[in-house]
C-alpha cells in the first residue's frame, strides 16, 4: 500500500490556521482522499491531556521552559505512535494543525531555547519523519493580535505572551521556511479568506500533480 501524505499548517496566533486546516481537509476529501485531521499539541487522549498542561492560562506553578519543551515532545511521541504513523501506513493523508516547526518557532525562537537540543529531541521522537508539505500562514504580528482580541474569549498561556515573543516566533518560522523551500509554502494570511484559500488551493493542486 502506498503511504499517505503528511501536510502541516503552521503560523503564529491569529493567522487563521484552524479555519484553513478545515479548508485543506475539505479540499482533499472532495478529491476522494481519505483525510485524518489532527492537531498539536494533542491529537490523542493522552496527548490532549498534555495539551491541557501546556495551555493552562492559570497554572498552580510556573512551567519551566525545559519542562515545556519536553512536554511538547512527549505529546508528539504519543501522537505519532497512536495516530499519525498508523494513518499514514494505511494510506490516509494526515492534515495537522502545527507540528515540530512550531516547537522550533515557539520554544526555540520565542523562548530562546537551544535549537540543537530541539533537533536532538526531534531526531529521537520522529525517526526521520517530516511533513511532505508545510503551509506557513504568515502575517504581521500586530494584525494577527488584533484578530485574537476580536475573538473575545479567554486566552491560553501562549496567547498571553507579548508582541516581542510573537515577533521572534514569526522570524523563526520564516527562517525555517527559507531553509526548506521545497517543503514550505509561505502564504500571505493578511488578506481576505477567499484570497488565502485560493493560494492554498493553488499550492495543493501543484503538489498533487507532482506526487501523482
Curated annotation (Swiss-Prot):
The top EC class, named as a word, is transferase
MF terms (GO), sorted A to Z:
ATP binding; dTMP kinase activity
Q: What does UniProt give as the signal peptide span?
A: none
What does the record list as GO biological process?
Answer: dTDP biosynthetic process; dTTP biosynthetic process; dUDP biosynthetic process
The EC number on file is 2.7.4.9
Pfam families xrefs: Thymidylate_kin
Q: Which family does it belong to?
A: Belongs to the thymidylate kinase family.
Main function: Phosphorylation of dTMP to form dTDP in both de novo and salvage pathways of dTTP synthesis.
Q: What is this protein called?
A: Thymidylate kinase
Amino acid at each position: 500500500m502506498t503511504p499517505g501524505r503528511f501536510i502541516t499548517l503552521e503560523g503564529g496566533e491569529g493567522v487563521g490556521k484552524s479555519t484553513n486546516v478545515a479548508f485543506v481537509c475539505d479540499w482533499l476529501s472532495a478529491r476522494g482522499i481519505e483525510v485524518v485531521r489532527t492537531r498539536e499539541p494533542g491529537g490523542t487522549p493522552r496527548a490532549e491531556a498534555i495539551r491541557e498542561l501546556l495551555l493552562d492560562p492559570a497554572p498552580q506553578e510556573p512551567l519551566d521552559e525545559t519542562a515545556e519543551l519536553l512536554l511538547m515532545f512527549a505529546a508528539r511521541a504519543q501522537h505519532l505512535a497512536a495516530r499519525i504513523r498508523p494513518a499514514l501506513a494505511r494510506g490516509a493523508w494526515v492534515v495537522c494543525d502545527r507540528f515540530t516547526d512550531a516547537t522550533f518557532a515557539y520554544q526555540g525562537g520565542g523562548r530562546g531555547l537551544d535549537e540543537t537540543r530541539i533537533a536532538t529531541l526531534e531526531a529521537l521522537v520522529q525517526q526521520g519523519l517530516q511533513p511532505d508539505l508545510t503551509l506557513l500562514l504568515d502575517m504581521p504580528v500586530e494584525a494577527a493580535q488584533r484578530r485574537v482580541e476580536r475573538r473575545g474569549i479567554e486566552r491560553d498561556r501562549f496567547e498571553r505572551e507579548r508582541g516581542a515573543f510573537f515577533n521572534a516566533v514569526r522570524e523563526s518560522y520564516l527562517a525555517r521556511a527559507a531553509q526548506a523551500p521545497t517543503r514550505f509554502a509561505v502564504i500571505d494570511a493578511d488578506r481576505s479568506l477567499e484570497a488565502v484559500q485560493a493560494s492554498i488551493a493553488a499550492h495543493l493542486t501543484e503538489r498533487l500533480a507532482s506526487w501523482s
